């Protein structure tokens, strides 16, 4: 624990480590971004990679979402400050959303922490500001409007960091972004969160064949039923997951019993990772619970910044990062391991929804950017030293101007990467990535048909897209 004066001096000293004008710099690359992307996919489920790439090719913003490893490599090659916070790691507009608190209030906050780690504060800010520019361009906003929205985000982030320096630590820890969401577009997302309940998921994701209870609907919303040894391995991990819950949460979990296990395709960046869903019931069939068991690979920033306090289990890393940045976290948030892989466990789509950034046109983009600025600043102030950060930023606007220049230049670079990605797909990039992933992945059931099926076998052969038509349908259905 350092004093306020020590924190102020440390922040000012960081201007020697990285001048504020240097925040705009983007060094010339010494790597091929497509090779970085392909390397990141090597441990993915091979036949789901076409779905991932199909989603990434929708727009430069979608590509940006699916290529966090590329930006991590760019950021890791730059000079950075030593002002450390808990990073979201993948701070873009789509990763802010509504969800229910343990007390059933609906709140808006950062909601994705797959890439969370301790690291330099500016990495989150640069990624989020870039996402604002890209989202605005995809929505049809002018370059001037996109730049202005990013400027508002950066200005408000700095202002909130300054405000947090005058708040008691407990007040910072409890801070909630309170808004009267009058915009019809945002209110639609809020209403969706209110309607997304376990009972609504039961109707949407499952069927009830006769007297055999509820089962996941195969292929609908890209969920497939899991059976055999694979199912047993997933269920066998639940007792270990239970130990990661607080005693009062364990009592809640103990009221439920598993009924079915499925495999789900999720998101854009996460497509290809292993993701299970478990349906459980409490006292009767009107008391369902859906758990998502989501594979967590090593952090995208691990090669560029050493988080000395990071736990070995990647699911635990995500849980700890989420709790550090959020005021409220999922009631049943925990972690486990299955067949040597680490997983995050949480409720599936319980009162959750998010804004579609591509539709944030006009004044909506700027207004939503203000909310995101407050939420990101809150997460950084909770987990870092706001006095040091405010001292570094100052009040002259130098840091804001430099970061704005970075956001515009990096958005331009992302669009160039997107064009290169499109060309690479036409030249067989997907096949090369599939081949690389196939060398590292387990054999398919067909290849192992004469041997006992191992617990690490993840997706039945018939469950994954096997043709361009199937892939297109999968991509259109979303997550």
State the predicted function of each range.
Residues 2-88, 93-191, 243-451:
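Conserved ATP-binding subdomain of kinase catalytic cores across diverse folds
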Residues 448-479:
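Long, low-complexity, intrinsically disordered segments
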């Amino acid at each position: 624990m350092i004093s306020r004066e020590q924190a102020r001096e440390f922040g000012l000293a960081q201007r020697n480590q990285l001048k504020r004008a240097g925040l705009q710099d983007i060094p010339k690359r010494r790597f091929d971004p497509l090779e970085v992307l392909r390397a990141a996919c090597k441990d993915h489920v091979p036949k789901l990679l076409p779905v991932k790439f199909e989603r990434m090719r929708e727009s430069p913003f979608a590509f940006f979402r699916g290529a966090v490893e590329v930006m991590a490599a760019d950021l890791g090659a730059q000079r950075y400050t030593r002002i450390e916070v808990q990073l979201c790691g993948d701070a873009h507009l789509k990763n802010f959303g509504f969800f229910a608190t343990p007390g059933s209030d609906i709140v808006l906050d950062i909601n994705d922490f797959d890439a969370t780690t301790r690291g330099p504060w500016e990495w989150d800010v640069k990624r989020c500001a870039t996402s604002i520019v890209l989202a605005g361009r995809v929505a049809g906003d002018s370059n001037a409007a996109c730049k202005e929205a990013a400027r508002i985000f950066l200005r408000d982030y700095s202002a909130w960091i300054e405000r947090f320096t005058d708040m008691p630590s407990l007040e910072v820890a409890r801070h909630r972004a309170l808004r009267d969401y009058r915009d019809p577009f945002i209110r639609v997302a809020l209403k969706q969160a209110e309607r997304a309940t376990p009972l609504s998921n039961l109707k949407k994701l499952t069927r009830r064949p006769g007297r055999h209870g509820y089962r996941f609907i195969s292929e609908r919303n890209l969920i497939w039923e899991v059976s055999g040894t694979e199912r047993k391995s997933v269920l066998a991990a639940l007792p270990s997951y239970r130990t990661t819950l607080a005693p009062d949460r364990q009592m809640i979990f103990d009221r439920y019993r598993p009924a079915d296990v499925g495999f789900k395709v999720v998101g854009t960046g996460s497509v290809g990772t292993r993701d299970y869903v478990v349906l459980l019931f409490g006292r009767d069939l009107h008391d369902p619970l859906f758990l998502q068991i989501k594979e967590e690979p090593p952090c995208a920033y691990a090669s560029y910044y050493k988080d000395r306090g990071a736990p070995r289990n990647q699911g635990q890393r995500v849980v700890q990062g989420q709790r550090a940045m959020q005021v409220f976290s999922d009631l049943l948030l925990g972690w486990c391991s299955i067949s040597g892989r680490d997983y995050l466990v949480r409720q599936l789509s319980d009162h959750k929804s998010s804004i579609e950034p591509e539709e944030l046109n006009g004044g909506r983009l700027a207004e939503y950017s203000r909310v995101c600025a407050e939420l990101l600043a809150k997460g950084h102030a909770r987990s870092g030293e706001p006095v040091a950060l405010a001292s570094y930023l100052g009040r002259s606007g130098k840091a804001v101007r430099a970061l704005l220049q970075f956001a515009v230049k990096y958005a331009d670079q992302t669009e160039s990467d997107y064009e290169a990605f499109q060309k690479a797909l036409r030249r067989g990039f997907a096949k090369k990535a599939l081949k690389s992933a196939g060398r590292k992945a387990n054999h398919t059931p067909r290849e192992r048909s004469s041997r006992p099926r191992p617990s690490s076998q993840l997706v039945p052969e018939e469950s994954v897209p096997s043709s361009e038509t199937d892939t297109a349908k999968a991509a259109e259905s979303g997550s």
